Amino acid sequence: MTALFTAPSVDEIIAKLGAQSTCDAGLTQDPWHFDTTTPSYGPGASMLDRLPANAPCQQVLPDEYRKASDEELQQRISDAKQRLGSKLLILGHFYQRDEIIKHADFVGDSFQLAKNATERPDADHIVFCGVHFMAETADILSTPEQSVTLPNLSAGCSMADMANIDQVQECWDQLGEICGTQPDSDGLQQIIPVTYMNSSAALKAFCGRNGGIVCTSSNAHAVLEWAFARGKRVLFFPDQHLGRNTARAMGIPLSEMPLWDPFKAQGGAADPADYARAKMILWKGFCSVHQRFTVEQVERARKAYPGVKVIVHPECSMQVVDAADGTGSTAYIVKEIANAPAGSAIAVGTEINLVNRLAAQYPDKTVFCLDPVVCPCSTMYRIHPAYLAWALENLEAGNVVNRITVDEDTAREAKVALERMLRVHP
């Protein structure tokens, strides 16, 4: 009789891989501790990134929520959700902690949740358990009568903050001087702007009014095909790695993918003509979680688990993607693990909350995070059940707290770019 395969625990896997510590001792503290300290992204992967001076800050959470037990918070969330009924829609990103995901009506990546935001026009309130740019997108795509709440206003995104509208406009103007602004003889635009979903509403609006489009990690290939059918080159922001990995998979050589550094004169190129010769101009931005993954970690996983399958998110570096067996969005990663045969070992290069959830969901498989010093997304971590309970009970009382609103002009232009994306990938 064949013995039942039992996957090792995450702790056992981490020990086998040689981890000695967590990302930061501050992770053991409740997130409301950081509501009264100097604003930052920490603790977590983004803790060393620069927080913009105008980043929204969360108000201090009332004592009754901070002091409530885990059990009480879960019960209060469930009760409030039941009482609000069909008036409420809760969206949860894959990277949220399990105590939040269990209450979500829809769980997915940013592309899936953007679509989900349009599917319940009967709901008065959308509570988005994710980060700021996702809630902005929900506000843009939902009806004017619906409110969108982000339970913790400090749940931002360091990558999204790596490109602001002033920087992008300056880049656009300089590239116009280098590449020209008039269509070529075939009617192709000189540059098509493409922004990753992980960006502000202002950048989505910029794309909308300049013939551009939004993409996600699940549809980047299709979006770039759309863009190259309309333009000679693409300005891709804010994540250089997704742009590079996708364009390279489409056959574009690295020599035609110069980097634009917003903190250097003319983007930092030794020769500005490099941008005129380019097919993909990549903004110098990155995800702090995915930038932690290394080729050395891939090699270590293969040594520890011979035959392991390595799958990573395309926000990882090109070198890590090349060393892996597969790359794709969080939805792709979920599907790959679900379809893997029992007894499989799968090393995953993405955020730890999702990896842990998949490891628990598939105990007949060994699913573990490539990064042995496990480090969550700093800002996804900010959505704690205490904030969700506080937001829902305020909605019950008729108070819409932490409402995310995008001004009418920005929303109109951003919606153009988002709807182009939705038509490319329905």
PLM feature segments, named:
Residues 2-348, 354-426:
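Active-site loop-to-helix "anion-binding N-cap" substructures in soluble metabolic enzymes
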